[in-house]
A protein has these predicted regions:
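Acyltransferase donor/substrate-recognition loop-hinge adjacent to the catalytic core
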Residues: 2-6, 154-202
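A short beta-loop-alpha structural element at the N-terminal edge
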Residues: 12-25, 194-208
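Acetyl-CoA-dependent GNAT
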Residues: 16-20, 27-83, 89, 202-203, ...
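Residue-level recognition of the GNAT/N-acetyltransferase active site
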Residues: 89, 94, 98, 127, ...
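Conserved acetyl-CoA-binding loop-helix of GNAT-fold acetyltransferases
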Residues: 93, 99-112, 276, 282-295, ...
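Conserved GNAT acetyl-CoA-binding A-motif
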Residues: 114-126, 297-309
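Conserved beta-strand-loop-alpha-helix junction that forms the acyl-donor binding cleft
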Residues: 124-133, 307-317, 334
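Conserved acetyl-CoA-binding loop of GNAT-fold acetyltransferases
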Residues: 138-147, 217, 321-330
Length: 337
């Protein structure tokens, strides 16, 4: 999408995307010079049909043709979030209709939908050196968000040999961090051997809700249910995990990996939540989950994992930095709020 000031033209009708719009969306996406993301777009449209309350997808029409589209998903509870927001997933305007205010009209429609549904913020991210996209975000009213994006490479030995400082870090971590790993770099291996870490399934819902309630002190059943559905149905690759000790679920890690989020053309794993039952803390459960996640991601040839953290959440940042995370080359942006 080019970035010069848009010249408004006659307002185009805007309506919700429908299943029959798939081919048009794929064609516009391809016309913008991107690698084919047909499967990703198809999953996003299907997800909106399954759970319309969690998705907002609109298009601008030019006669019988689509002039542009925008897709977003509701964010509900990632790392303690209390107020809902919208995650901008995909936006595109047909090249010959750019510079005519179509993108702005689509974002305005998205923002209006969010306000009606209690989601007053529109969130997204971009690489700091994607100057064209950053200029467009600026023109559309986005500003830098407070969240800090951190990421790390999924290296050959990072998960098995990463050392972690054993002391507790300060700050509000929402209880979603286990600081129990010993400084000895064999602890991750031992924890993974002791804990039964396996791919998350729908049958785990009640156990995950139980652990989450013990960690956060809140009932986030709806959020957990929706995240589990996203992990099972919406992502191209299932990477969420549970950890069991003595036959019961004592921790979980929710992550997703897909091709297309935020306009990226390479798959990246995104960590949404990690939690360990406080009764099973200081036993390396968090380390075991991360260790297995790294092994799985390497097998899938996914090279990076990222998450977003409140800058004042020093406890969570300390835990992630100890696992090899560092500030990302991507910046978080927000509109509204």
């Amino acid at each position: 999408m080019t970035t010069a000031a848009a010249t408004p033209s006659a307002a185009l009708p805007i309506r919700p995307l429908a299943p029959g719009d798939l081919e048009a969306v794929v064609a516009i996406d391809a016309a913008l010079g991107r690698r084919s993301r047909r499967a990703y777009i198809e999953r996003r449209l299907a997800a909106a049909l399954r759970e319309p309350r969690l998705h907002a997808q609109f298009c601008a029409t030019d006669g019988d043709a689509l002039a542009g589209y925008v897709l977003a998903r509701v964010l509900e509870g990632e790392f303690g979030r209390s107020a809902p927001a919208l995650r901008l997933e995909l936006v595109g305007v047909r090249p010959e209709r750019q510079q005519h205010g179509v993108g702005r009209a689509l974002l305005d429609a998205l923002a209006a939908w969010g306000q009606r549904h209690g989601a007053n913020e529109l969130r997204t991210s971009a690489a700091w050196n994607d100057h064209a996209l950053l200029a467009w975000f600026d023109a559309m009213g986005f500003r830098l968000a407070a969240g800090l994006i951190v990421d790390r490479a999924v290296g050959d030995d990072a998960d098995d040999e990463r050392r972690e400082d054993p002391q507790d870090a300060p700050g509000d971590t929402h209880g979603e961090v286990d600081y129990g790993l010993q400084a000895d770099n064999t602890a991750a291996l031992l924890a993974r051997d002791r804990a039964d870490v396996r791919t998350m399934s729908r049958a785990d819902l009640a156990d995950i809700v139980r652990v989450d309630r013990r960690v956060t002190g809140r009932d986030r059943s709806a959020y957990i249910d929706h995240k589990l559905a996203e992990a099972m149905d919406d992502a191209a690759i299932r990477v969420s995990l549970t950890a069991r000790l003595d036959g019961q679920v004592v921790g979980f890690l929710m992550a997703r990996a897909d091709l297309g989020d935020y306009g990226r053309i390479d798959p990246v794993a995104v960590l949404d939540t990690i939690a360990v039952d406080p009764a099973w803390g200081h036993r390396g459960v968090g380390a075991a989950l991360f260790s297995q996640l790294g092994i799985n991601l390497r097998a899938l040839r996914i090279e990076r994992i990222e998450t977003i953290v409140a800058p004042q959440d020093f406890g969570l940042l300390g835990f992630l930095y100890a696992r090899g995370f560092a500030p990302s080359q991507r910046l978080a942006f927000v509109r509204g709020g």
